């Protein structure tokens, strides 16, 4: 009987898989928000045009947005075990959100902040 050997290349271990998991999730979340071909509903990633004007202080609209965004993100990012979406600011042409999450296989909470300005999303550092 003849044996064949198959060579495989294993990914390099950085020694800190948690860090790479966190970086990967943040990178993929930012891609979900900023990609023109995002699977997220356009209403959730377009900075909520309804707020451009008189609705930015509408608490029901803000609550609806947070629930819809949370549901969509949990559907598209299976590495998130728990997620809370918070609106930090909602102005006419600016929207700031904070995603507070727990990842599977990670014991520390992860915060990911985004701001919608000038027609696109920008990542900010948590305070």
Curated annotation (Swiss-Prot):
Among InterPro entries, the record links this protein to:
Anti-adapt_IraD (IPR023776), IraD/Gp25-like (IPR007048)
One GO cellular component term noted in the UniProt record for this chain:
cytoplasm
What Gene Ontology molecular-function terms does this entry list?
anti-sigma factor antagonist activity
UniProt-listed SUPFAM superfamilies = gpW/gp25-like
Q: Where in the cell is it found?
A: Cytoplasm
Q: Which GO terms describe its biological process?
A: cellular response to oxidative stress; DNA damage response
Q: Which residues form a coiled coil?
A: none
- Provide this UniProt record's keywords sorted from A to Z: Cytoplasm, Stress response
What family does the entry list? Belongs to the GpW/Gp25 family. IraD subfamily.
| Family annotation (NCBIfam families) | PRK14128.1-1, PRK14128.1-3
Q: How does it assemble?
A: Interacts with RssB.
**HAMAP family referenced in this protein's UniProt entry, alphabetically:** IraD (MF_02010)
Role this protein plays: Inhibits RpoS proteolysis by regulating RssB activity, thereby increasing the stability of the sigma stress factor RpoS during oxidative stress. Its effect on RpoS stability is due to its interaction with RssB, which probably blocks the interaction of RssB with RpoS, and the consequent delivery of the RssB-RpoS complex to the ClpXP protein degradation pathway.
Its name, as the record gives it, is Anti-adapter protein IraD
Gene coding for it: iraD
């Amino acid at each position: 009987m003849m044996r064949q050997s198959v060579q495989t290349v294993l990914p390099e271990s950085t020694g800190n898989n948690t860090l790479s998991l966190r970086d990967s999730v943040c990178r993929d979340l930012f891609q979900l928000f900023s990609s023109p071909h995002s699977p997220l509903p356009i209403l959730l990633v377009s900075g909520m045009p309804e707020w451009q004007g008189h609705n930015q202080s509408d608490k029901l609209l803000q609550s609806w947005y947070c629930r819809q965004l949370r549901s969509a993100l949990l559907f598209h990012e299976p590495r998130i075990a728990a997620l809370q979406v918070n609106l930090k600011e909602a102005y006419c042409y600016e929207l700031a959100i904070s995603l507070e999450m727990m990842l599977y296989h990670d014991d520390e909470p992860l915060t990911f902040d985004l701001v919608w300005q000038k027609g696109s999303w920008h990542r900010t550092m948590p305070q």
